[in-house]
Each structure stands twice: as structure tokens, then as C-alpha cells.
């Protein structure tokens, strides 16, 4: 199984377009300690030829250009991307669908709830129905979006996308609006969970034994954005677990047998983005890799 992390940042990327927090300021200045990062997306293939795109970032055209595996290869119109799978309806996971509208056949997969958030917005009708097939997938149903690649979706604690929030919103609920994926090929297993509000025993059982885990790395501490002075929301309010602390992802997953552990979907205010920081060193010392754009895994 071949895995390419196309985009390793959370919504807005690094640096964010209007941000001068300490981390974004380093990125704007071209400081080598902070790599620029595009928004959350990965691609997975069983053979290096046919690819499944997981989440369609607003930066998808840039990501395709930066990764030769994703380039058109033949004829006037072609793409090695055979299917797209959404893990939620967040803007940074669906906006890139609008870029994939140029008459290229593929199948869009998601749970009924996630797909409804796309179907209910007519702007996505630019993906012509006769070209882009939309396929609903039930939780715990195993399917093959690309031949040789088996995928199972499961609910994880999360929340509805920001643009669908209302007074009834519940943070940490386990529904079909935020899902994790277990991807299998050639006897290897990859767990991809870019959004998760908390770690449950069921989640730990789901991912136990995986050869690699790509997990929500939005915030180091719950109050990262507040500390940076650029926002008032906590990680929990955004539906994202913190890395540190007794209930954080590092401690909560420490006793789970997993091969490689990689943080993805990293917010611009997370100090682990600074490569020589004590925060980065601490995370790495506990067995985690901080993803960057273009990172590849061969399982």
C-alpha cells in the first residue's frame, strides 16, 4: 500500500493567509524551521497507479502539481485519482471538489449524512452527475473504492461542520458526520482519522494492530489558539482532541499496538510545527511523527 500525505495542515494551511502568529510569521519569513503546509488530504493506492483521494482540500490543484504520482499521464484528459472519500463535511475537506469538476470521471464516497451536506448545496452540481457518481456508504460496511483497496468507515467522536452548526449541536457525539477509515491492501492496515474529539475504548479496539495511524494533530494543548492570541475557541470546541495531557491523544493511545504513528491535520498555532522546538522533540520522543506535505509511507 502506497500513501502520500498531500496536505498536512488543518483549515487554512500554514501560513494562514492573514495570520501573523509566531508560527505563521516564521513561515512568511521563509524560516526553514517551519515548512509551509497545505490543507488536509491524503492519497492511497494499492499499486501506485490507481489512487483513492481522502478529502478534497481547497489546495488540491497545488497538491496534485507537487506530487508526480497524481499527474495526468495519457490523452487529453486523465487522472490517476479514481475515487474520492470524505471523512466529514468540513470546508477544508470538501471545497476541493469544485476543482475536480473538469469532466473527469470518478466516484465520490461518503456516509449518507456527509454526502447529504454536499448534495444539499447546489454549488457542487458543477460535478456533473453523469460524470461523477455519488455513492453512499454505511458505517462498518467494507467496500472497494479502488480495486485491491478495502475500506471500512466507522464513527468517531466529533461534531458537524462549522457551517452546519446550530443550537442543537453536540460536541463529541459519535454519528456518521465524522468518521475514521480503516484501509487495507496487501495484508497491511492503515487507519486515517483526521478529526477526533476524544479517544474511546471502541476507537482503540478499532485501530489496534494497524501498521500505521494518521491521526488528528490539530492542537498540542486544548487552548493553543487562545495562547497564540488569534482566537477564542478551544480544540474541544472545534471537535479536536489535544495531543498532550492525561486525556490527550498521545497518552490515550500509548497502550495501543500500532506500527507508525503520524499526526496530520495540524493547526497553524500548534508549536510542534517548529522543527527545533521542545514541543516537537517531546512529541517525537513519545513515538509520533509530525507530518509534512509530501510525506510518503509504503506499507
From Swiss-Prot:
Matches recorded under Pfam families: Lactamase_B_2
Record's keyword annotation contains Repressor: no
InterPro entries linked: Metallo-B-lactamas, PQQ_synth_PqqB, RibonucZ/Hydroxyglut_hydro
Biological processes, Gene Ontology terms: pyrroloquinoline quinone biosynthetic process
Chain segments annotated as coiled-coil in the UniProt record: none
Alphabetical UniProt keywords: PQQ biosynthesis, Transport
Keyword field contains Transmembrane: no
Pathway listed: Cofactor biosynthesis; pyrroloquinoline quinone biosynthesis
HAMAP family assigned: PQQ_syn_PqqB
Family classification: Belongs to the PqqB family.
Record-linked NCBIfam families: PQQ_syn_pqqB
Function in brief: May be involved in the transport of PQQ or its precursor to the periplasm.
Name this polypeptide is given: Coenzyme PQQ synthesis protein B
Species annotation: Methylorubrum extorquens (strain PA1)
Amino acid at each position: 500500500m502506497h500513501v502520500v500525505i498531500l496536505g498536512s495542515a488543518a483549515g487554512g494551511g500554514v501560513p494562514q493567509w492573514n495570520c501573523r502568529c509566531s508560527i505563521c510569521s516564521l513561515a512568511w519569513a521563509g524560516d526553514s524551521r517551519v515548512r509551509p503546509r497545505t490543507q488536509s488530504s491524503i492519497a492511497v493506492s494499492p499499486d501506485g497507479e490507481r489512487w483513492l483521494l481522502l478529502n478534497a482540500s481547497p489546495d488540491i490543484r497545488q497538491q496534485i502539481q507537487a506530487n508526480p504520482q497524481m499527474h495526468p499521464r495519457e490523452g487529453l484528459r486523465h487522472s490517476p485519482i479514481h475515487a474520492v472519500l470524505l471523512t466529514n463535511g468540513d470546508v477544508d475537506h470538501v471545497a476541493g471538489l469544485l476543482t475536480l469538476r473538469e469532466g473527469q470521471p470518478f466516484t465520490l464516497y461518503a456516509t449518507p449524512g456527509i454526502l447529504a451536506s454536499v448534495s444539499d448545496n447546489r454549488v457542487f452540481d458543477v460535478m456533473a452527475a453523469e460524470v461523477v457518481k455519488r455513492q453512499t456508504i454505511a458505517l462498518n460496511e467494507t467496500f472497494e473504492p479502488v480495486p485491491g483497496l478495502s475500506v471500512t468507515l466507522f464513527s468517531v467522536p466529533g461534531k458537524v461542520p462549522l457551517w452546519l452548526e446550530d443550537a442543537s449541536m453536540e460536541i463529541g457525539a459519535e454519528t456518521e458526520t465524522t468518521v475514521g477509515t480503516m484501509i487495507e491492501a496487501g495484508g497491511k492496515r492503515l487507519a486515517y482519522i483526521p478529526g477526533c474529539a476524544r479517544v474511546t475504548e471502541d476507537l482503540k479496539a478499532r485501530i489496534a494492530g494497524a501498521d500505521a495511524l494518521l491521526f488528528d494533530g490539530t492542537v498540542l494543548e486544548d487552548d493553543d489558539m487562545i495562547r497564540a492570541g488569534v482566537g477564542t475557541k478551544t480544540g474541544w470546541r472545534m471537535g479536536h482532541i489535544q495531543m498532550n495531557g492525561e486525556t490527550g491523544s498521545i497518552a490515550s493511545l500509548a497502550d495501543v499496538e500500532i506500527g507508525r504513528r503520524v499526526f496530520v491535520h495540524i493547526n497553524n498555532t500548534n508549536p510542534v510545527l517548529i522543527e527545533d522546538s521542545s514541543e516537537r522533540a517531546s512529541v517525537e520522543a513519545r513515538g509520533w511523527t509530525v507530518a509534512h506535505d509530501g510525506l510518503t509511507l509504503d506499507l
